[in-house]
């Protein structure tokens, strides 16, 4: 009854107005799963490759008809009749069918759409929500949201070098309370920025993109906004950064144009250590560039004992890259983006490897998102305790938060909000 009888892909739009792939998988018993694939703005060189058409006369070359055709043709032919409940076999077949190390022939966007839609169809057939289907009875930890409320870098048109400034409502008792805290701080920040003469337009991930030049000024605005909303920074909520430093790593130096600094890896670490000494920052993502292993080693030795150091471009959700990082002692956490690796099974393997080696894991969106809320379920299914899915504006971001509210409600007394326990710094 869980045999795949139909697979249909289509081209839809993501939150940036760019095409992406959506896939429907239908089973013999009529159950259906649907998944839409996200896309990143700042992408790691080692990510699985999303397939774009390259036809400049159509969607400026960003169309995904080739990926759609691959799903509706070659992938459908290979998977038709397969058991949707055997996720690992499905994913293995997809990987072997593609035949490349980075999924570039069929496209990670084609492969991931099918992988996730298959899992959702199997969950529907089992009459289970996705988080329970994937995670089983132990899936009951609601994640701490990392809310990106000031945007810079590749996510905004302002001079701020650091890509994301985040709040983490660590002091909340429940996820719903954490979401309320975040929303109240978000609105307090909007008022303070407006009062200071800054624009309050939002960036790709729903955060504000004010025309300020320094990280310290951005962090000070957030601390003040939290106080204005009635919350204590360092007690009720903490701060986080996504430096996205690969974006400004040039010829062995970190060129921070907004800050007016050019530093070597050791200097970059000292710059971040200075911010940590001044503000209650508990998590830093991509503090060094993806292939700057020496910088990562210095950073981990300097701050790894008191700050969560998250590898995004460093690990690209790839168990092989993560294994290298673990061996070399780089970072202490992995950012998990399903489209960086391209299948559900490989995503789960990355989280499992992280947990077995005492690394934390953070489930994450991309800057180009859709209304698909799969990652909300996966954050609970994997008990990773943290989710990064943008600010408190734009429905492509709030869709994930709202799904987590539903999951918390469904779990009832069994629900556990991760809170401070999710972070090694606390």
UniProtKB/Swiss-Prot annotation:
Pathway: Carbohydrate degradation; glycolysis; pyruvate from D-glyceraldehyde 3-phosphate: step 4/5. The keyword Nucleotide-binding does not apply. Its cofactor is Mg(2+). Its EC number is 4.2.1.11. InterPro entries: Enolase, Enolase-like_C_sf, Enolase-like_N, Enolase_C, Enolase_CS, Enolase_N. GO terms for molecular function: magnesium ion binding; phosphopyruvate hydratase activity. Binds a second Mg(2+) ion via substrate during catalysis. Mg(2+) binds at residues 242, 285, 312. It is an enzyme of class 4 (lyase). GO terms for biological process: glycolytic process. It comes from the Bacteria. Gene3D superfamilies: Enolase-like C-terminal domain, Enolase-like, N-terminal domain. It is found in: Cytoplasm; Secreted; Cell surface. (2R)-2-phosphoglycerate binds at residues 163, 337, 366-367, 388. NCBIfam families: eno. Catalyzes the reversible conversion of 2-phosphoglycerate (2-PG) into phosphoenolpyruvate (PEP). It is essential for the degradation of carbohydrates via glycolysis. Belongs to the enolase family. This is Enolase. It comes from Phenylobacterium zucineum (strain HLK1).
């Amino acid at each position: 009854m869980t045999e795949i009888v139909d697979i249909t892909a289509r081209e839809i739009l993501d939150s940036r107005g760019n095409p992406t792939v959506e896939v429907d998988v239908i089973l013999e018993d009529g159950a259906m799963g649907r998944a839409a694939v996200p896309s990143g703005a700042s992408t790691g060189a080692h990510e699985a490759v999303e397939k774009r058409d390259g036809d400049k006369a159509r969607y400026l070359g960003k169309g995904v008809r080739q990926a759609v055709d691959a799903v509706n043709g070659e992938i459908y032919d290979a998977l038709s009749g397969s058991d949707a409940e055997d996720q690992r076999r499905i994913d293995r077949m997809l990987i072997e069918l593609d035949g490349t190390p980075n999924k570039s022939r069929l496209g990670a966007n084609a492969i991931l759409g099918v992988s996730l839609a298959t899992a959702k169809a199997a969950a529907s057939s089992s009459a289970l929500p996705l988080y329970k289907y994937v995670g089983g009875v132990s899936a009951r930890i609601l994640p701490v949201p990392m809310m990106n409320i000031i945007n810079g870098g590749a996510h905004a048109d302002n001079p701020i070098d650091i890509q994301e400034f985040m709040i983490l409502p660590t002091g909340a008792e429940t996820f719903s309370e954490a979401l309320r805290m975040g929303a109240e701080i978000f609105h307090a920040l909007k008022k303070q920025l407006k009062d200071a003469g800054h624009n309050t337009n939002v960036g790709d991930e729903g955060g504000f993109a004010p025309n300020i030049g320094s990280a310290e000024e951005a962090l000070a605005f957030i601390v003040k906004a939290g106080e204005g909303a009635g919350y204590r920074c360092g007690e009720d909520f903490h701060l986080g950064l996504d430096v996205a430093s690969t974006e400004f790593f040039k010829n062995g130096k970190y060129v921070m144009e907004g800050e007016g600094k050019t530093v070597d890896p050791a200097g970059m670490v000292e710059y971040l250590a200075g911010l940590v000494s001044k503000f209650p920052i508990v998590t830093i993502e991509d503090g060094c560039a993806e292939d700057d292993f020496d910088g990562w080693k210095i950073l981990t030795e300097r701050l790894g004992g008191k700050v969560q150091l998250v590898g995004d471009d460093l690990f690209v959700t790839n168990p092989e890259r993560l294994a290298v990082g673990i061996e070399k002692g780089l970072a202490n956490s992995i950012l998990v983006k399903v489209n960086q690796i391209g299948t559900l099974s490989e995503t789960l393997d990355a989280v499992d490897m992280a947990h077995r080696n005492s690394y934390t894991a953070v489930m994450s969106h991309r800057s180009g998102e859709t209304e698909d809320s799969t990652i909300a379920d996966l954050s609970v299914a994997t008990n990773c305790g943290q989710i990064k899915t943008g600010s408190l504006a734009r429905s492509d971001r709030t869709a994930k938060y709202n799904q987590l509210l539903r999951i918390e409600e469904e779990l009832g007394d069994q629900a556990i909000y991760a809170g401070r326990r999710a972070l090694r710094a606390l």
